[in-house]
């Protein structure tokens, strides 16, 4: 039976006394009774602990993970990296790093969230000394939520402008065009010098209306970061509309989010298939696909190829952001997260590979139409979405239809990644709030404040100098360097501080069997080595940010970027040092105490079953201000 210490209110349960499920006792020492929330005995009385929300169906979780992890990077970055780094040869380092780095950490984050039933911060109660990992992931995902939505705002703007008989970026003569503007030409026009009586060489020096629409109308690009300029109100309204969409996708929690992603995560695949069918029927499409896949074996020995593969894996798998942990925390305790993680990883990488056929069939057509090499039209990132593809659709029949389809797909790809990222941030935030702070509409108000704060910060990115701010966030705040640092410490903490075998046992408790030993080996050895190797390479061969190969950022702009990066990377060592300095006892005693897990209420039955192995377990009633029941394992 449970015994209460009269002095400190701690309930202890010895291993030989526990039979069956362990129920937290009430204030009189008797088991808590009644239906509804589980009772927690406290010196002041019984405290109701609200149950954690769970997915209505497991497919809701699968769709949410697909929507979050499969995003813009799969469509606009992977195909270009594959072409740039040797075509089909790039798949070799990509698959290898996925096996030793991407999939193991992807599985680690989901299973950790499911086991601890907590968001990105409280999930590190598994090893409280390293709770700084949770704060770091919150910082990174906040930065991502802030700048990532700008791509949606631009995409929404292009989508609205697509509903016209003539696309505004297809012709010159608008107020934003310059005298150097020349409308998009086909190869036969150039050969006949039929455009404004200019030769092909002269045409090459002119500016495309697509570029002028992007730079002069959408971005209203100023001279640099030091020239912010005024707000672009049209794009600002699109940004506001996107944040309103995100709010209503997230405000009711996973019950509503899990339904919305059925559309936002699946419809982009329908559009990709439609665009692929249209693309392969165009002249020159086959040449584009060949350029995409043609192997260049000499590239395999280049370190940059392996660095690009590793960075793409960690970025596209959405590792280190804490959102996967938050999504996993809403799973049933016995859900087979191992199978889910493998399936989701395959979907993610498969989508990247498939998107390459869509992109390069269109680029091959565009290269053939303009009589230029594929390298002249191949773009990555915003250049593909807002320059290369808009230019390509102007050469197609019924151009507005294909433009609208593409930007609608772009909007959906980014939207579910965005609102799941916000969900991950809100989950981590609300898990920290004690029960005494609970009030009606707590979640709705928290989501509104988060969206409003991000929107205010985003206003700096819809000014004339906004693109320079966007590039700072993109290059530093959630770069490969910060994600690799985060992933390295996650593996070290779980495998070497908590214990890889111990965590494998915890997973076996959830799914009924131990995962493949490969996962344990990766967490312990291979993955940390890969992460640290790429991290060191990125630091040693660091190159300052340059926009469009022309604009060099001032020293204070680069310092601002490093401040973004270090604000998350320093969370781990600073939190660790702070905890060790505040604790009492010898350094060994402090380490032992601070690395003891803090268990949640759902662990009681599980821990009770192996108490004879793990020793004494204590149920510690915390203050009434806390809504989390903790169990401290004394080992």
Swiss-Prot record:
InterPro entries: Na/ntran_symport, Na/ntran_symport_creatine, SNS_sf
Source superkingdom: Eukaryota
GO BP: any one term: neurotransmitter transport
Residues with PTM Phosphoserine: 623
Tissues/organs with expression: Predominantly expressed in skeletal muscle and kidney. Also found in brain, heart, colon, testis and prostate.
Reaction catalysis annotation: creatine(out) + chloride(out) + 2 Na(+)(out) = creatine(in) + chloride(in) + 2 Na(+)(in)
Compartments it resides in: Cell membrane; Apical cell membrane
Chain spans, region Disordered: 1-28
Family per record: Belongs to the sodium:neurotransmitter symporter (SNF) (TC 2.A.22) family. SLC6A8 subfamily.
Phenotypic consequence of residue 554 to L: In CCDS1; decreased creatine transporter activity
Consequence the record notes for mutating residue 337 to W: In CCDS1; decreased creatine transporter activity
Segments on the Extracellular side according to the record's topology features: 82-87, 160-230, 291-304, 363-394, 466-479, 542-560
Phosphothreonine PTM positions: 42, 617, 620
Membrane topology designation: Multi-pass membrane protein
Keyword Ubl conjugation: no
Phenotypic consequence of residue 294 to Q: In CCDS1; uncertain significance; no effect on creatine transporter activity
Effect of residue 87 to R: In CCDS1; uncertain significance; decreased creatine transporter activity
Post-translational modification: Glycosylated.
Protein name: Sodium- and chloride-dependent creatine transporter 1
Gene: SLC6A8
Effect the entry attributes to changing residue 552 to L: In CCDS1; uncertain significance; 35.0% of wild type creatine transporter activity
Glycosylated sites: 192, 197, 548
Pfam families, per database record: SNF
Role played: Creatine:sodium symporter which mediates the uptake of creatine. Plays an important role in supplying creatine to the brain via the blood-brain barrier.
Transmembrane segments: 61-81, 88-108, 139-159, 231-251, 270-290, 305-325, 342-362, 395-415, 445-465, 480-500, 521-541, 561-581
Ranges in the topological domain labelled Cytoplasmic: 1-60, 109-138, 252-269, 326-341, 416-444, 501-520, 582-635
Annotated phenotype, changing residue 285 to P: No effect on creatine transporter activity
